[in-house]
């Protein structure tokens, strides 16, 4: 089995799931991180998305602080109204993110498994990179394995799983942690089968 552990941070309002950032960690050590460029886009769509994010207290407290932040002299030259460093190379148009995510998953191999923690929304967010669920590109799995579901199958609760040291709601840090937990669960399952 080859696996890609991933996590999305997104704005969800009961109707839409709009991506903010994605982190992916492959079994071979490769990593991917990107921030939806719509958060930095000029024009009506970008302004509207930023406005909706700004009004979402939980996102502002838990997700936005983990997006790329200005450093060095940049801190003195960026408008205070900016949510994060819009000029960071991780900030990309969603179409480019879709291409890079597809390439990342395909590079993992033909039998790739996707894993996420509470992964239902993550998979919908992933699938919507290419439109409808049936429009998934070849090589991108039609489903994501869920860490919480596997933990419950093994009789484990939240307190039985390793805790994340830091970076909670940084999509890449979450993907790395997902890999740690998934490896533990897969190892336990292999022990059960023996």
Where are these regions (language model features)?
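Substrate-recognition/cap helix-loop segment adjacent to the acidic, metal-dependent catalytic center
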Residues: 105, 120-141
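Acidic, Mg2+-coordinating catalytic module of metal-dependent nucleases/exonucleases
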Residues: 110-120, 124-128, 158-194
């Amino acid at each position: 089995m080859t696996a890609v552990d991933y996590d999305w941070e997104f704005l969800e309002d009961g109707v839409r799931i709009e991506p903010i950032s994605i982190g992916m960690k492959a079994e071979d050590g490769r990593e991917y991180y990107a921030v939806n460029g719509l958060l930095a886009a000029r024009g009506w769509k970008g302004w509207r998305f930023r406005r909706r994010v700004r009004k979402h207290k939980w996102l502002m407290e838990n997700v936005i602080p983990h997006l790329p932040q200005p450093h060095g002299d940049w801190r003195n030259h960026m408008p205070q109204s900016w949510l994060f460093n819009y000029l960071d190379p991780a900030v990309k148009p969603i179409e480019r993110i879709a291409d890079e995510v597809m390439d990342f998953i395909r590079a993992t191999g033909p039998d790739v498994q996707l894993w996420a923690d509470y992964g239902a929304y993550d998979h919908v967010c992933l699938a919507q990179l290419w439109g409808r669920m049936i429009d998934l590109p070849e090589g991108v799995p039609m489903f994501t394995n869920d860490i919480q579901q596997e933990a419950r199958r093994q009789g484990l609760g939240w307190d039985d799983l390793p805790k994340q040291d830091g970076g909670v709601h940084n999509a890449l840090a979450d993907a790395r942690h997902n890999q740690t937990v998934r490896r533990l669960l897969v190892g336990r399952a292999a022990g059960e089968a023996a």
